[in-house]
Structures are given as C-alpha cells and as structure tokens.
C-alpha cells in the first residue's frame, strides 16, 4: 500500500496538521497543490493507496485554486481522508466541497476531519495550534 498526502498549505498550518496525522504512515509521498510547475493531471493514484487530502478553509470554503488542482488528480478508487484546516472560527462547507471534488476525481472518501491551526491573519486565534491539545 502506498501512502500520499495531497496538500495546499500557503501559510504552513495545514502542512503541520497533515504531518501530525500522517506521522506514522509508511513512506508518505507529498503532492503539493501550491506548486505552479506541476502537471496534476499526470498523477494516477494506485487503487490500494491511502491518501490524506488537506486544505485550509478561507471564508468557509476551500481555496478554488486548490480544488481545481485536486480535481485533476486521478484517484482510481484509492481510500481518502479529507482534512479541512481552519483558524478556530468556522470551516463552513469546506469538507462538503472537498468530498464532492474527491468523489468526482475517483477517490473513495472514508473519513473527514476538521482541524484547528493558528489563524493565518489574526494570530491570536488558535495561537500555537496545532499542538498536543
């Protein structure tokens, strides 16, 4: 079984959350959705793989750029865990949006998580998150 993390983490908070979740997964390969030089349509995930997809929630939705790039990846029925990372305010419909995109791309969603990270603009909100709490 191969393990992947598909990330969009412009300020690093989402990446920290994803690392905490996948720290015991063997040989995780990272696909960075913020890369401007990557052909995301070239990714074909093996069907027996486990994939973590993590994105921030900005204004209750996932960034459209991240959704558009994620939609290009062929999930090939790989099992997928979704993570919406938010700054202790709200994550709105981010997980629903991610699930719709994952299903359309051929992933099999098995779990969804909302996780708190330090707010990217107002750092007093969820300061220091994620942490052991």
Report residues per predicted region.
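FMN-binding flavodoxin-like domain, especially the glycine-rich phosphate-binding loop
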Residues: 1-36, 40-133
């Amino acid at each position: 079984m191969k393990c992947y993390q598909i990330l969009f983490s412009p300020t690093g908070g989402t990446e920290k959350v994803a690392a905490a979740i996948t720290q015991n997964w063997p040989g995780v390969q990272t696909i960075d959705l913020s890369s401007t030089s990557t052909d995301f349509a070239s990714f074909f995930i093996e069907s027996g793989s486990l994939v973590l997809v993590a994105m921030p929630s900005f204004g209750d939705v996932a960034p459209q750029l991240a959704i558009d790039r994620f939609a290009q990846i062929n999930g090939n029925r790989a099992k997928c865990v979704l993570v919406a990372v938010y700054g202790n305010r709200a994550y709105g419909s981010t997980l629903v949006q991610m699930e719709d995109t994952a299903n359309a791309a051929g992933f099999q969603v098995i779990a969804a998580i909302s996780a708190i990270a330090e707010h990217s603009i107002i750092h007093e909100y969820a300061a220091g998150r994620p942490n052991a709490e």
